[in-house]
Amino acid sequence: DMNGTMFSGCIAVDETNASKLFSTDKGGMIAYITANGNGQRIKLAISEDEGNTWKKVDKIAADWSDDPLQNQDFRDPKVFQWEGKWFMVVAGGPLRIYSSEDMVNWKVESTYPDLHTECPDLYPQEVDGQVKWILSRGGRYYKVGDLKEVNGKWTFVPDEYYKDKDGVMNFGRDSYAAMTYYVSGFGTAAHPTIPEIVELNWMNTWDDYCNQVAEKVGQDFNGTFNLHLKIGLKNVDGVYRLTQTPIDAYQDLRDKGTTYTATVGPDNDLLKGFQGTSYEIVSRFMPAEGTKKVGFKVRTGTNGEETLVIYDLEKDAITLDRSKSGIQISGKFSETNSQ
């Protein structure tokens, strides 16, 4: 429309019609959408039927031209509630934090000209009797710190460990643009009400081949989604580390399982004859002396196709090798990925 092409954003629930955008006090859902055209801005749309239909609102929530950094990369808004007010993180280029009392009119709280990312996210976790905040940089890297008022402005302050470095959030080659989902606001520092926070990533990458996948494999869409992951924090030697665990609901998808306890050798392939398009393998290895690598060949085919999942005992590294995994999109796609 006149505001530009619509890109990514997020949805928040206005339970009390604080925005005055809805026809009743029951409120509804507000979508915050990037509009790209002569710079970027955040526009609004609303739904009063739980997301089945949407109506654009003639209102710009925030515009790059009004931002102190004057940077046209002003996209990927993520909205959350904390301490009785609404917050929005925006980036695409440098990170900004905005706040609002009514979900419609927003003011800048703090800017981070040297911290660039797409798809920013900011959410809390309770650990060691306190609330810590995780800043996601596109789902690839993260920082842990505090969201607090500094000189009257809400500011993300990273922990000392994360001031000049990031934690690695996802080692997967095809994992980007993470988004989190949850069912309520986060409460207050005095009374936090932090729900389970679930993360979902785009299973593709801008690094090399994302725009080649659909054509090579005959799809009409660009990528798919990774597993849903439950977010957590863990204190490791005084440093808070992000944890990501597949949600418990995946266990409901389990079919009949098979258990093996055996010594693996050249003549007793435990998975020989096993067929399936998706499966879960839970394993424990007790390597014999001199063993250097253990792992699995999965999705094997009669034409030599296979995907290798290998743990290297000497390097203490796990490796995914898909150089023979069917259609090869590009050289980058075929590269071995280790962590």
What are these regions (language model features)?
Residues 45-48, 97-100:
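Conserved Ser/Thr-centered positions that define the repeating blades of beta-propeller domains
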Residues 1-23, 51-81, 90, 106-124, ...:
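Surface loop/turn signatures of beta-propeller and other carbohydrate-active proteins
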Residues 18-32, 85-87, 129-134, 192-199:
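Entry beta-strands of beta-propeller and related beta-repeat scaffolds
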Residues 33-37, 90-92, 137-138:
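Beta-strand C-termini and the immediately following turn/loop, strongest in propeller blades
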Residues 149-151, 159-165, 169-173, 184-339:
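Beta-rich accessory regions
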Residues 121, 126-144:
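Loop/turn-rich, solvent-exposed surfaces of beta-rich toroidal or solenoidal domains
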Residues 35-39, 140-141, 206-207:
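Short glycine/acidic-enriched loop and turn motifs that connect beta-strands
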